[in-house]
């Protein structure tokens, strides 16, 4: 099959319909200037063959294949290729009867792409199958040799060359089919997995469940009969046992009483043996003390002597230590004295200040005395002037005149008041007479007024009976508003802190239904209460990541949470029942307290509060570390030989016994625990306010009905009160009321006048007495004048004396002030002297310390000798113990007798209790037998079978106690089974089993298919290997022949890489003459192009295609090589059609038909020339 004609219309540069006909069946060449459209003819052939990689036809999309991309009015591109199909043995499958085959492909801009085969529409797959059947696969075009492909072949690696060989052999298509088969296998495996998943997750669990339900159903059905049998068996045994105990109780009581008598006799005998042992022990003890006492005494005296000497030396040591201690105490006293002097200096300074203030007070006292003196002198001058006192402005005669005027005025007012009383009494009498005439009207008004007042009082009592005070609800609502505001503020604070501490929130879903959440205690950080806020940084560093651990009651709870708790983050869980905690040993804690002081290093565990149930978890987190106040203390605790325990300072620095130190900047140290502490306080405060808010809400709710009732009654009270006030106003307008008011007013005026008359009479009497007194004073003034003057002069003298004393005190204060200043200076000098003495004492303490150390060494030596002697004394005591062995034997025998006596007493008590028990059992069992016979009527008819072998009541072959346990268990099981048993389980189980068998059958079928496909793939792999080997041999032979034709005097071959076989890849080797080149880099560019072209043509020759297209493959070759290509094509490809694009005459002159392209007026044209006549 070869091309006869190509028709192009609107394709690339061929705008108008252009028919290229007369193709030679063997060798055709196309030439022309660059851009004239020669390669477009090759592109049109590829276009018809169905190419999908448009880069090989130099286009980005199909629209670019249309002339000027549809911009010149041409909107479609059509290419038709006519093939000569006269050779039927080379025809495509299914087209053997067609002498010609015309394949057309058309694309429309923005439209669809269509194919036609012999004028009929065809699918792209049909076109591909047509060309594939004659080795024309345009999407893997080994028949299309472009100049770029030559270069590409030169750069190929061995596996890529092998891939070209596979393509030539046709095994590449097998690989594609193999991949499809493997995908099919994968799909079948997916199906098998789905079946397995269905079996594992649905069918098998359901089948297993139904199998269990079936077993339960059968167990329940069979258990009912067994339950009845066991119940009768146990009742029969209970009856027999009760009869047996009843009958044996009578005999047992007599036997027990006989045993009691025997025990009493044995007890008396044992007591005699105990007394005998006591005598022997006493005799042996006296003999031991007599024989060994002297030696012990000597050694004891030696030990005592050493102890006394050691005491003397220890005394000296204590004296020196006391002296040293005394000197140290003196130092402390001096230090305290210095401190006291400093304090006294401050006190003297304060006293000076106080003295100055006292002087100011004395100055004020002196001023006050001066003022008093002035007043006395003034009064003295007044007496001299004839006044009663110094303050009076008038003399006694003027005062007498004024008093007489006052007597006259008081007498006039008294007369007027008596006249008014007479008038009021007269008018009151008249008004009362008029009032009596209006009495009936007054009684009627009074009755109605009383009724209205009673109504008001009744409503008031009803109001007072309501347990509600006016304004109480408003106060509660005010409290509610205040509490609500506080609660909202605290809730905002809690939310803010909770958001900042989100990592401490542990949220989970219940892992099982009805899960007890109290088993989950919470995060460690939220379970502790820090006792001292200053230790928060140290505690946070001590705990580290354990602060985020979650505490639960057991490992089962932890496992449930991890597996089914839907946890949002990774957590570490501490189960209280399994956690291995470690706490620093008490002796280490005591050693630490002795070394650095109890307050300087504390166990971290003691600094936190927690619930007792959390003890194990808290010991695990905080039990192994000390918290120290300073770095020096922390070092001492960590590195001391007797302690060696991790320690943390308050600033968060860590000291490990291994020598590892961790510290430095710690931004926000303890911040998390502080925030947690603040959060706990806020939550506690929030709960308190929420409780108070709830209480207020509750009170409001309780008071609402009372408030409503109070409001209603209060409204009634206001209404009644208003009604009463209106009535009172009306009553005030009637005649009787007016007369009553007038009488009342007159009575008040009369009463007031009567009370005033007494006052006026008293005032008149006082004025009269004052006149008399003044008259007497004037008479006595001359007599007393001299006395008063003397008294005043005496006072003046006294005040002057006091002023002198105050002046003296003032001077004394000034002197005291100077004295205090001098004392202050003296104290400062004494302080300086004490500081010098302190320095000398510190030197003396250093000397005494050395002497104490020497004396301590001496005491230690004596202690060693004393300890050795004491050890020897103890050895002698040990020997004395051996002497005690015999005594111990007697003591042991005595103790055995005592124990025997105790046992017999206990046995006697048991026997007495047993007698009581048997008598009780006899009575109880008699009642029990009667009740059993009465309750179970079948006992009377089957009683004779109880306990007989071979019957249902054989108590020997079947243990009654085991039967009782079986009965109880069976009753429990049957009760549970009856609730759970599924009555339809038999039919459901059969249906589920059928589904299971069907799926297993389907699965087996699929797995058999998989096995067959795998086997076929293995067989085809072997055939592929054989085919590739044959292909390699044939292509290798043609490769060498073609290359030697193109480049005479050379050889070429394909061989596997070193240390490999041909399936690992093939590489090209070249020889010039008989010398094989080590590398292709030794070849020139033209030689390498010929070598690549030879390989390509050799591959094509293995399975020749009907058509080959070469596009300027001779571009890099000189003229002689180009001519050789033409000759090679004629020699090696006699049955294939070649279409070659070339610009060199050496190439296209060898062609039978030459097509020349030109570019005229923007459109390509083609001219055919026959260069040689085909034979």
Swiss-Prot record:
Primary location: nucleus
Residue span, SMC hinge domain: 518-638
One of the protein's GO biological processes: chromosome condensation
Domain Zinc-hook: residue ranges: 2-1161
Cross-referenced InterPro entries: P-loop_NTPase, RecF/RecN/SMC_N, SMC, Smc2_ABC, SMC_hinge, SMC_hinge_sf
Chain sites annotated for binding ATP: 32-39
Superkingdom in the source lineage: Eukaryota
Intracellular or extracellular location(s): Nucleus
Coiled-coil region: 172-508, 673-1028
Tissue: Highly expressed in roots and young floral buds.
Keywords in alphabetical order: ATP-binding, Cell cycle, Cell division, Coiled coil, DNA condensation, Meiosis, Mitosis, Nucleotide-binding, Nucleus
One MF term in the entry's GO annotations: ATP hydrolysis activity
Gene3D superfamilies xrefs: 1.20.1060.20, 1.20.5.1700, 3.30.70.1620, P-loop containing nucleotide triphosphate hydrolases
Any single GO CC term annotated in Swiss-Prot or TrEMBL for this entry: nucleus
Family: Belongs to the SMC family. SMC2 subfamily.
Subunit structure: Forms a heterodimer with SMC4. Component of the condensin complex, which contains the SMC2 and SMC4 heterodimer, and three non SMC subunits that probably regulate the complex: CAPH, CAPD2 and CAPG.
Job description of the protein: Central component of the condensin complex, a complex required for conversion of interphase chromatin into mitotic-like condense chromosomes. The condensin complex probably introduces positive supercoils into relaxed DNA in the presence of type I topoisomerases and converts nicked DNA into positive knotted forms in the presence of type II topoisomerases. Also involved in chromosome segregation in meiosis.
Domain notes: The SMC hinge domain, which separates the large intramolecular coiled coil regions, allows the heterodimerization with SMC4, forming a V-shaped heterodimer.
Protein name: Structural maintenance of chromosomes protein 2-1
Organism: Arabidopsis thaliana
